[in-house]
Amino acid sequence: MTEQGYITRTIEISGRTFSVDIGRVAGQASAGVLARYGETVVLVAATREALREGLDFFPLTVDYEERHYAVGRIPGSFMKREGRPGEKAILAARLIDRSIRPLFPRNFTQDVHVVALVMSVDQDCSPAITAILGASVALTLSDIPFAGPVGAVIMGMVDGQLVVNPTLEQDEKSDLHLTVAGTREAINMVEAGAKEVSEEIIVEALTKAHAEIQRIAEWVGEIRAEVEPLGLAHPKIEVPANEPGPELVEAVRSAGYEKMRAAVHHCKNERLDKKSADRHLEGTKAEIINAVLENFPEEEQRLKSLVDKLEKEAVRELVLKEKVRLDGRAFDEIRDISVEVNVLPRTHGSGLFQRGQTQVLSVLTLGAVRDEQILDGLDTQETKRFMHHYNFPSFSTGEARPIRSAGRREIGHGALAGRALEAVLPGEDVFPYTIRIVSEVLSSNGSTSMASVCGSCLALMDAGVPIKAPVAGIAMGLIKEGDEVAVLTDIQGTEDHLGDMDFKVAGTEQGVTALQMDIKIAGITPEILAQAMAQAREARLYILDRYKEVIPGPRPEISPRAPRIIHTTIDPEKIRDIIGPGGKIIRKITETTGVDIDVEDDGRVFITAPDPEGGKKALEIIKTLTAEVKVGEVYLGRVVKIMDFGCFVEVIPGVLGLPGKDGLVHISHLAHNRVRKVEDVVREGDQILVKAIGFDNQGRLKLSKKEAMEPPAGGAGETGRPGLIQDDRPDRRPRSRFSRR
C-alpha cells in the first residue's frame, strides 16, 4: 500500500501495462478503481441500492461517459460541454452491460449502477476494453454479488496474423475487429466487424481470446484475495432466496404441467404464428393461475413467476427431448422468406425483406460529401460517410405505445447492421457518395437486426451502389441444459425470450462481416460457437440464393432520382482559384449550374449535380479556372489586345465573366521575319496558334507565334522578302502588367 493509502496492481496485456489503483478514488461507491491501459485512463465505479420488492427483472444500468478533455479538446456544441452520449459511447456501454449482466444472480433485484468515466485516451489502448476490465475489478471488490471476474480483449488480424489488442495503426490495417469478454470458464460476449473473414479464423480468434481472458480473470481474482485483508474488498451481501413454498410449487406443477405441455404441443402441431401462439399460451397460463390462485390468494406474484417458468420448461423440453421447435421447425430450418426491391418509387433505393413474421423495409438515400456525419467523439475519425439507422415502432409488436427517439437498443441494432455492410461498400475514390440507410421494422418476431442487414443490402443493390458482394444475416439461438445442447437457426421471439443465447452472424458467400452474441447463462464454449457459425453459414448462403431470384447484383446504373457526383482532383494551390475572394467564384459556379461543390484541403473536388448536364458544365468551369499553361505546348488563342511592343493572346478562355489566362507575344516573336508593326501580322479578335515559351521573373506568361509555326523554306520571311531573319536582340519588357484581371 502506498503512503496515500491505496494500492496499484499491474498486468501485461499485449506488450502494454494494464493497472488498477484500488482505494484511491470514488470512496463513497460500493467500489471504485482507476483503470489505466497505456495512457488510457478510465474511472469505474459500481454502486447498488437497497432491495426493491416485486421486481421480476434485474435493474442494471451501465453508463459510459466520454470527456473531451481526455483527448485535449473542447466540445463543439454551443454550450461547450458534453451532452447526451454519442453513438460510440452508447455502444461501449452496451459492451460493458452485455459482458457483466449474465453474471449476477437470477433472483437479485437491487438496482446496480456501473459508471465508466473516460478521462484520458491513448488511441493505441482501447478505452472500452479498459472500462470492461475496470468494471470487472470494481464489481469483484464490491459487496455486490457477482459471479466474475471478467476479462476482455480485442482480436485483430493483420497480414494474416491474429493480434491481441491491436494498436490504432494495426487496427486500421486489420481485417478483423473482434471484441470478446468472458470468465475463466467460458465466453459470454462477442461483438465483431470483419472483412469477409472465414468461420475457421473467427473460431481460432475466439479460442486465442479466451486463453488471454482466462489469464486476466485469474489476475483479477488474485487481487481480491490480496486486498481483502487490507479492507479494500467487501464481503458479498446475501441474496434473499425469495423462493416460493413447496406447497405452491407442487400446486402449480400438479395443475399446470400437463396443460402447459399440451399447449406447447398444440402450437407445434398447428404451426401457429406468433399472435396465435402467444394467445394460446397466455390463455393456458391464465387457466393455471386461476386454478391455483383460489388456494393461494396472497401469492399472485410468485404464482405468475412459477407459471412462466413452467412455460419455459415445456418449450425447452420440447426442443431438447423431442428435437422439434415450438413452431414445428427443425433445428436448422429457416422460416419462409420474401424479397422485394424498388418498393418506394421516389426514393433512391429500397428493399423489403420478410422472414416469417419479421418484416423490415430498408430505404437508401445517396447524398453529397457535405452530407457526411460530423463526429464529435474521442476518436481520430472526424466524419462518417455511411450511416445505418434502425427504427423499431411499437406497432411492429402489436403494442400501443408512443413513439420515442432512438434508444440504446435501436442504436445498437443500427450499428450492428451497418457494421455488417461496411466491409462490402465501395471506397470513396470509386463511389464518392454519402450513404444513409434507414431500416423500418414493420413486424417483429425475432432477429429484426439481421432482417435489417438483408433489407439494407437489397436497398444498396436496388440503388445501383457497386457493393463488392451481397450480405445476409441470420440469428442463431441456444438451449442448453447440462450437457444437452440445441443450436437453433433463425430464432423467433419466443425462442429468444426462453432460450440461452442470441447469436447474430452476417456475411457474404466468402466470409463473415459482423457478429454479435447476447447470452443469458454464465458462458458458452468455443465449440458451441463453432457449431452455431457453421449452421449460420448454411442459412446465410440460402438467403443469398433467394436474393438472386429477385436481384442478382447491383443495378448497372445508380437510381435516376439520385444526384450525380463528379470527382476530380486539382493542385491544392489552385483551390483559391475555385473559391475566389469571400467565396464569390464558387457561389457563382453553383448559381450558374445548379450544383453543389465540396472542395477538400488535399485538392479533391466533388460536384453534386441534380442532372448530368449541370455537373458536366461545372466540371468544365473548374477545369478552366484551374488549368495551367504548360511551357512547350502550342495553344489556339485569341488576340485580345494590341500594343506597340506586341499583342496579348488569351490561351485559356475566361468563364462566368471572369478573365481567362493570357500572355504576351512580343513583336519579335510574331513572325520569323522582322515585324515593324504588330497590325501587319495580327488584328484584335484573330485566332492564332501560339507556343508557351516561359514566364518572366514576375511570373507572367510569354508566348511565341513564330515558334508555333514551321520555319519558312529557303529562309524567306512571311512577307516573301528573302534574307530577313529574326534578330538576336533581347525581348523588351514594358512595365505594365501582362495579365488581365
UniProtKB/Swiss-Prot annotation:
SMART domains: KH, S1. Residues 703-741 are annotated as: Disordered. Mg(2+) binds at D496, D502. It comes from the Bacteria. CDD domains: KH-I_PNPase, RNase_PH_PNPase_1, RNase_PH_PNPase_2, S1_PNPase. PROSITE patterns: KH_TYPE_1, S1. It is found in: Cytoplasm. It is an enzyme of class 2 (transferase). Pfam families: KH_1, PNPase, RNase_PH, RNase_PH_C, S1. GO terms for cellular component: cytosol. Residues 563-622 form the KH domain. One of its GO terms (molecular function) is magnesium ion binding. Keywords: Cytoplasm, Magnesium, Metal-binding, Nucleotidyltransferase, RNA-binding, Transferase. SUPFAM superfamilies: Eukaryotic type KH-domain (KH-domain type I), Nucleic acid-binding proteins, Polynucleotide phosphorylase/guanosine pentaphosphate synthase (PNPase/GPSI), domain 3, Ribonuclease PH domain 2-like, Ribosomal protein S5 domain 2-like. Residues 632-706 form the S1 motif domain. GO terms for biological process: mRNA catabolic process; RNA processing. Its cofactor is Mg(2+). The keyword Chloroplast does not apply. It catalyses: RNA(n+1) + phosphate = RNA(n) + a ribonucleoside 5'-diphosphate. PANTHER family: POLYRIBONUCLEOTIDE NUCLEOTIDYLTRANSFERASE, POLYRIBONUCLEOTIDE NUCLEOTIDYLTRANSFERASE 1, MITOCHONDRIAL. Involved in mRNA degradation. Catalyzes the phosphorolysis of single-stranded polyribonucleotides processively in the 3'- to 5'-direction. Belongs to the polyribonucleotide nucleotidyltransferase family. This is Polyribonucleotide nucleotidyltransferase.
